[in-house]
């Protein structure tokens, strides 16, 4: 199957926007699930962080006005998302998700990603969560989800 759209900055930004929309849509459900086993703030924290990430991307993309730089690369979008999540999402989720996006941003200076590149960045993200959380498959963590 071929992609109709390139896996570039526009794609990576749309991916973050889609994730933010999904989190917003399921915020209350995520919070209720967390309340059953924790402090009940996961949905709220994650929603706040994802909205902040989208706002950061919007401000950076608007201000660059075609000037080039890291926001011409999917890795720049992923790194900006990582740093925003690290700064805005509390609890264990902030460091775990921030690390996931930071590791994914190691994809490098590729303006357009292949499907193999996307698979690699997702594997890097999972590896980051595993290392940061000291988790193994089967430990009933987000790696198992």
Name each model-derived stretch.
Residues 1-145:
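N-terminal loops that bind phosphate or other acidic moieties
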């Amino acid at each position: 199957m071929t992609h109709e759209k390139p896996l570039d900055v526009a794609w990576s930004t749309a991916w973050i926007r889609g994730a933010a929309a999904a989190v917003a849509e399921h915020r209350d459900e995520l919070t209720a699930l967390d309340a059953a086993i924790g402090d009940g703030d996961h949905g709220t924290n994650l929603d706040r962080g994802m909205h902040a990430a989208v706002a950061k991307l919007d401000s950076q993309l608007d201000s660059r006005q075609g000037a080039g730089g890291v926001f011409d690369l999917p890795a720049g979008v992923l790194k900006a998302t990582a740093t925003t999540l690290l700064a805005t999402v509390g609890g264990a989720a902030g460091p775990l998700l921030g690390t996931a996006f930071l590791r994914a941003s190691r994809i490098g200076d590729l303006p357009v990603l292949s499907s193999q590149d996307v698979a690699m960045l997702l594997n890097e993200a999972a590896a980051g969560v595993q290392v940061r959380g000291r988790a193994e498959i089967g430990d009933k963590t987000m790696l198992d989800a």
